[in-house]
């Protein structure tokens, strides 16, 4: 059985696993494969949280020695419509992202990878992301792309490291649980 830390908060289960960064990168990163998956998303290239990752947002992963992967497992009541996914996920995502950024700030040279935003980036509330007009990000201190934006396989991460399956909605309803996955590389 896989060893990881577990914590509960308001029905959400938080699971944490620390692994060797080099091993995680070799086993779970396939940027070309996942870039193709990301291209079908309507947010692709429209926010600084999404790929393609270019310029200063490119990361050299070689200096990192550990990767702390954090999963928020969110129970979903039966027959919850898919249309409610954002309203369920966003408050938990924002809390998890704040914690990831706090962890990043505590250790020099570390880097947080936040969760995929279901509605794109939400730091420019009310205005379009600066990426659309080819301007620099307005909130570089807050915006961190997700693991999948850098080509990490989250389904395999979830299965191999946390013994959980990535579930998908069916017939217009959400599955029995949803997950958010973030990380801090140090």
Language-model regions, residue ranges each:
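N-terminal donor/sugar-recognition subdomains of glycan-related enzymes
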Residues: 7
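Catalytic cores of enzyme domains
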Residues: 4, 13-186
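Non-catalytic, low-structured ubiquitin/UBL-interacting segments
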Residues: 1
């Amino acid at each position: 059985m896989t060893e990881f830390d577990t914590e509960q908060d308001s029905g959400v289960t938080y699971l944490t696993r620390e692994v060797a960064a080099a091993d995680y990168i070799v086993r779970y990163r396939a940027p070309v494969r996942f870039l193709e998956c990301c291209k079908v998303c309507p947010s692709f290239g429209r926010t600084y949280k999404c790929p393609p990752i270019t310029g200063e947002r490119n990361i050299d992963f070689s200096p990192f020695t550990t990767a702390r992967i954090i999963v928020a497992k969110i129970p979903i009541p039966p027959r919850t419509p898919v249309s409610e996914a954002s309203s369920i996920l966003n408050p938990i995502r924002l809390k998890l992202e704040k914690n990831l950024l706090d962890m990043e700030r505590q250790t020099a040279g570390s880097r947080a990878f936040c969760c995929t935003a279901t509605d794109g980036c939400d730091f420019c509330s009310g205005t379009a992301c600066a990426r659309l007009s080819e301007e620099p990000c307005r909130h570089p201190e807050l915006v961190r792309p997700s693991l999948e934006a850098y080509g990490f396989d989250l389904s395999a991460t979830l299965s191999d490291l946390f013994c959980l399956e990535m579930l998908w909605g069916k017939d217009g309803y959400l599955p029995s649980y949803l997950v958010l996955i973030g990380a801090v590389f140090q």
